[in-house]
Curated annotation (Swiss-Prot):
This is CUB and zona pellucida-like domain-containing protein 1. Residues 25-146, 154-265 form the CUB domain. Gene3D superfamilies: Spermadhesin, CUB domain (2.60.120.290), Zona pellucida, ZP-C domain (2.60.40.4100), Zona pellucida, ZP-N domain (2.60.40.3210). It comes from Homo sapiens. Disulfide bonds join C17-C58, C85-C107, C154-C180, C207-C229, C442-C498. Residues 1-24 form the signal peptide. Keywords: Cell adhesion, Cell cycle, Cell division, Cytoplasmic vesicle, Disulfide bond, Glycoprotein, Membrane, Repeat, Signal, Transmembrane, Transmembrane helix. It comes from the Eukaryota. Residues 276-519 form the ZP domain. CDD domains: CUB. PROSITE patterns: CUB, ZP_2. The chain crosses the membrane at residues 569-589.
Length: 607
């Protein structure tokens, strides 16, 4: 009885601990101690399905002892549809804790596939749920990647009225761990019709693994039209003149990928005729209702070159190249103009007289100051109508890997070593072969608005930096190189801006052919065709590594919260339970030993 009396308090304590653990399990709080990979150098990716419970608050940190970035994708998110973004969400932070910069937030109201990228080798995400008792499922997939390594043909910019593109390696298996973004943008007043000729991606009901995401606008924040995978051939139509397509793949089951094409559909209703000028063509839109007065549906309309035919849809559309279809190019008073004529004459039973209206549409594009001026003349029985509009030159600037200017660098931001040679090219996108690009001024700035401070690399066509080399005139391309530098006062980014002149290549007296000219001699005010391009940011590699953690990265862990069933209180309970078991066992053994003391071994006396 004495033994029972002594053991009773310990027994009650053990039962109390067990009851506490049983109650915690009955409440259904999910464990936040999911083991995320990353500390192991051999592990480059991880996927997991999280089954979340009410009143959850969990935080995970992904780390890797290597200078790589992390891309995390939430390809399937099922949260409380009635919950607010404040009470139930997923937050992603750049760094080792939730105190780092917020990369973004995910909730049930989001209309996109959430994808986030860290600036260094650490990333943290936190999941908070409300008290509603519903099913919640989140598929999380992340992997480590090097921003300075790109996959060929993975994404790009498409700006023609029609075109096609495919997944990398198509029709061979697509690459693993790929994230490709294609931006499609056509001229104003058009919509985009996207048609997938083939899609062969991993089949999954929720498209969690390999998928295509189509967005109705210029970015992945524009609104999701569809997320597809498997073996389907869907068609999508934008509501504006831009569309974004994303391909995301995981680490297994690579198939053929996809093949897609797109066309443009004129979206606006017009009463007569409109004209749009770009760097390589004139685009004329004629209303079919306007042509009804001529008993025509557009089939009898033609340019100066009758072999150039219009495209017939809900409107009649002419795409007139600046160097074809009979377009006349003229240089006068430091100005370049392009002119063509659209004519129509109804068939007549007599070769002498006609009682039908005659139609002649004169279209003219004039290159102006940092823009193109569009003029259209319509003559109908000696009545002339005119319309004016404004556009801009189509120029772009890019970095290249070498002085061969063959392989473009697509990373942004682009991380470089101090004093590394950078190769820059400004391109004029036009079909006119008789134009040449001249680099007038190029400068650098630590900010994208080019406020103070700025640093001149090229001015008046002359190199202002000892490492800067300007290449000779080369058609539609202006090229130069310089060595990477950093602005003082810890400004990590560098942006480049170039102002260029566009000249007639046959004019040997043009400013472009004069090369480097001192300020007192230069005069470009009369030049109407000039424009500028911007690229950036460029950052030093040491700035990138400094933003991450130094030293050995510890194992990925979960922060402890009050809602975790295996928090410090429960851990302490387990320790008490184990200690009590050991104590009970010790007392029991000692009790039985004391009861049989006569069988003890005794030390023999020495003789």
């Amino acid at each position: 009885m004495e033994l029972v009396r002594r053991l009773m308090p310990l027994t009650l304590l053990i039962l109390s601990c067990l009851a506490e653990l049983t109650m915690a399990e009955a409440e259904g709080n999910a464990s936040c101690t999911v083991s995320l990979g990353g500390a192991n150098m051999a592990e480059t990716h991880k996927a997991m399905i999280l089954q979340l419970n009410p009143s959850e608050n969990c935080t995970w940190t992904i780390e890797r002892p290597e200078n790589k970035s992390i891309r995390i994708i939430f390809s399937y998110v099922q949260l409380d549809p009635d919950g607010s973004c404040e009470s139930e969400n997923i937050k992603v932070f750049d760094g080792t804790s939730s105190n780092g910069p917020l990369l973004g937030q995910v909730c049930s109201k989001n209309d996109y596939v959430p994808v986030f990228e860290s600036s260094s080798s650490t990333l943290t995400f936190q999941i908070v749920t409300d008290s509603a008792r519903i099913q919640r499922t989140v598929f999380v997939f992340y992997y480590f990647f090097s921003p300075n390594i790109s996959i060929p043909n993975c994404g790009g910019y498409l700006d023609t009225l029609e075109g096609s593109f495919t997944s990398p390696n198509y029709p061979k298996p697509h690459p693993e761990l790929a994230y490709c973004v294609w931006h499609i943008q056509v001229e104003k007043d058009y919509k985009i019709k996207l048609n997938f000729k083939e899609i062969f991606l991993e089949i999954d009901k929720q498209c969690k693994f390999d998928f295509l995401a189509i967005y109705d606008g210029p970015s992945t924040n524009s609104g999701l039209i569809g997320q597809v995978c498997g073996r389907v051939t869907p068609t999508f139509e934008s509501s504006s003149n831009s569309l974004t397509v994303v391909l995301s793949t995981d680490y297994a089951n690579s198939y053929r990928g996809f093949s897609a094409s797109y066309t443009s559909i004129y979206a606006e209703n017009i009463n007569t005729t409109s004209l749009t000028c770009s760097s390589d063509r004139m685009r004329v839109i004629i209303s079919k209702s306007y042509l009804e007065a001529f008993n025509s549906n557009g089939n009898n309309l033609q340019l100066k070159d009758p072999t150039c035919r219009p495209k017939l849809s809900n409107v009649v559309e002419f795409s007139v190249p600046l160097n074809g279809c009979g377009t006349i190019r003229k240089v006068e008073d430091q100005s370049i103009t392009y002119t063509n004529i659209i004519t129509f004459s109804a068939s007549s039973t007599s070769e002498v007289i006609t009682r039908q209206k005659q139609l002649q549409i004169i279209v003219k594009c004039e290159m102006g100051h940092n823009s193109t001026v569009e003029i259209i003349y319509i003559t109908e029985d000696d009545v002339i109508q005119s319309q004016n509009a404004l556009g801009k030159y189509n120029t772009s600037m890019a970095l290249f890997e070498s002085n061969s200017f063959e392989k473009t660098i697509l990373e942004s931001p682009y991380y470089v070593d101090l004093n590394q040679t950078l190769f820059v090219q400004v391109s004029l996108h036009t079909s006119d072969p008789n134009l040449v690009v001249f680099l007038d001024t190029c400068r650098a700035s630590p900010t994208s608005d080019f406020a103070s401070p700025t640093y001149d690399l090229i001015k008046s066509g002359c190199s202002r930096d000892e490492t800067c080399k300007v290449y000779p005139l080369f058609g539609h391309y202006g090229r130069f190189q310089f060595n990477a530098f950093k602005f003082l006062r810890s400004m990590s980014s560098v942006y480049l801006q170039c102002k260029v002149l566009i000249c007639d290549s046959s004019d040997h007296q043009s400013r472009c052919n004069q090369g480097c000219v001192s300020r007192s001699k230069r005069d470009i005010s009369s030049y109407k065709w000039k424009t500028d391009s911007i690229i950036g940011p460029i950052r030093l590699k040491r700035d990138r590594s400094a933003s991450g953690n130094s030293g050995f990265q510890h194992e990925t862990h979960a922060e402890e919260t009050p809602n975790q069933p295996f928090n410090s209180v429960h851990l302490f309970s387990f320790m008490v339970l184990a200690l009590n078991v050991v104590t009970v066992a010790t007392i029991t053994v000692r009790h039985f030993v004391n009861q049989r003391a006569d069988y003890k071994y005794q030390k023999l006396q020495n003789y």
